Amino acid sequence: LYSSAASDVYKRQVEDFTRALDLRDGIYKVNYKSDGVTYDREAFASTPANVLVINYRASKPGSFNADFSVNCQVDADISAKGPILTWKGTLKNGMNFEGRVLIRTKGGTVSASGDRISVKDADSCTVVIAMETDYLMDYKKDWKGEAPSRKLDRYAAKSASTDYAALKQAHIAQYKSMFDRVKVDFGKTEPEVAKLPIPERLKAYKNKPSDPDLEETMFQFGRYLLLSSSRPGTLPANLQGLWNEYVKPPWACDYHNNINVQMAYWGAEPANLSECHQALVDYVEAMAPGCRDASQANKKFNTKDGKPVRGWTVRTSQNIFGGNGWAWNIPGNAWYALHIWEHYA
């Protein structure tokens, strides 16, 4: 999603600019002043509503203006009608996708033209983004499920009509029910270090590893990453993470059945985020039939009397459509079984 409200920050004179990710409530926040007006922006991914939410506010009534469009880097049909932007298409592998941007303002006007929506003279603006594909994690159904439009019809409009405060409250309540389970205390950081921005503290830590508060923050940041990228009913955390910046990420953002997946889930049980482990457990169960077929087709795995093996194992790299590549990782199946045991034990 392209928003001129975000990009114009780099073109105008601004002061008191701050941006932060609040690990306590899982909300990204931006604040700055320009021409005597204070602008605030908040964004979060809502599990209860299954949407991304962005809220823009201006301290002076009628001061928020922005154009919204979709910068889609794959072939897609993009259109705007009323307060809704829609984009849809089919990827080269046959997977269908659709996304909707639904815009609601307080004050001002909303108009659509071509593939763009313009907001003028508003006090505030809430943007709800909903996206779906027809992917289904089921080998027997060839990984294809319900049409994305039918999925979106069930919840997108309802989420967009919900008051921003209610969306935010529901998100925070669900997020904190998991995040607040664990607190750590590694000591106290010196005041002159604690007041520095995180990038400077990370740099200073390399020279003098004495910043207990930073260590606590990084521990909780790791929990935040898993909490935000692996929930029941979703795909598990992948190589680059769900929220990486790429359309075409390195290694196709697949799964490497080795320490890459293992590191992502180190904190699932010890850090009291057991629900996050469920996505990996479901993924292993869904991939097992395809892995069994591939394992039995490999004659090198045959038993001494020449029969295919009864079990299965994995190759090092794997994608969500059951594809396996690179070298066989023969003990990989046992390692996945250990994850399942740890989850239920």
Language model features by range: what are they?
Residues 219, 226, 257-306:
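Carboxylate/His-rich catalytic cores and anion/metal-binding grooves
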Residues 169-212, 216, 233, 238-245, ...:
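Active-site-proximal, well-structured secondary-structure segments within enzyme catalytic domains
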Residues 54-55, 225-228, 261-274, 334-345:
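Alpha-helical support elements that line or immediately flank enzyme active sites
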Residues 162-166, 188, 206-215, 226, ...:
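Structural helix-adjacent loops and short alpha-helical linkers that scaffold large soluble proteins
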Residues 204-215, 248-258, 320-331:
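Solvent-exposed loop and edge beta-strand segments that line ligand/cofactor-binding
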Residues 1-6, 10:
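Single conserved hydrophobic/aromatic residue that forms the stacking wall/gate
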Residues 291-335:
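Active-site-adjacent "gating/activation" loops or surface patches in catalytic cores
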Residues 21-24, 32-72, 117, 121:
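Acidic, contiguous internal or C-terminal segments within carbohydrate-active enzymes
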